[in-house]
Amino acid sequence: NQFLIMRFNFSEVSSNVNEVELSFKLHCCSKLKDFVFKYEDLLGKEIWDVLDEKIQEEPGAFLSAINSYATRKKNIRIYLLIDEYDNFTNTILSTYGTEFYRKATHGEGFIRGFFNVIKSATTGTGAALERLFITGVSPVTMDDVTSGFNIGTNITTDPWFNDLVGFSEKELREMLTYYKEQGVLIQSVDETVVMMKPNYDNYCFSRSRLVDCMFNSDMVLYLSLIH
């Protein structure tokens, strides 16, 4: 409870080149408005005084206004999360080619502009936007907006974070033991682990942790399908 959470999920943005920019704006502005409504009691109703209708229609201006207001309050800390940051850009690149992709991520592209605002929002003493965590499939899009957003660190292959996502075998066995005790699991825990290992236990994100593969935390939950 140290931070107010500002959350985006770019998988919700349309990858149709005729709709993508508007879809991106609508998604970001909707999430920013949700953020203000959710934390209105902490931010103070006065925040709406700095968020006129025009600002609420432009993601960069909206984010900048929230950050400036929260920074002036001095006791607000914001953690920004972006899930699947490259979802729609990867689709554009693979479907429409580099021309449309570059329009979004280079020069005055709307994605590049948004990341420029994020970078700017984190600068300065006491900036409310303190931390960022961004996930995606590949670093391609991030590389293309990097000159604007050059404050991030790629932790994908850092050994320290190898088990950040997924279940270790120990965690899996604990979960399966619980379901076995509840009468949900027909097979023994050992039998289930043996069956799951070849299919769901091959996730490793660091070369130095090759013996610490993780189980896919989504797939191992479909216990009813392995009866």
Predicted features and spans:
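Conserved P-loop NTPase "ATPase switch" module shared by AAA+ and STAND
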Residues: 75-101
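Substrate-engagement module of ASCE P-loop NTPases
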Residues: 65-71, 101-129
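Conserved small/polar residues in nucleotide/adenosyl-binding loops
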Residues: 226-227
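Structural recognition of the conserved hydrophobic beta-strand(s) that form the central parallel beta-sheet
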Residues: 81-83, 113, 130-137
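Conserved nucleotide-binding/hydrolysis micro-motifs of P-loop NTPases
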Residues: 11-16, 86-87, 138-143
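P-loop NTPase motor core
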Residues: 1-37
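Short glycine-rich substrate-engagement loop in P-loop NTPases that contacts/grips substrate
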Residues: 50-66
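Amphipathic alpha-helical segments of the small helical/lid subdomains adjacent to P-loop NTPase cores
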Residues: 139-148, 155-223
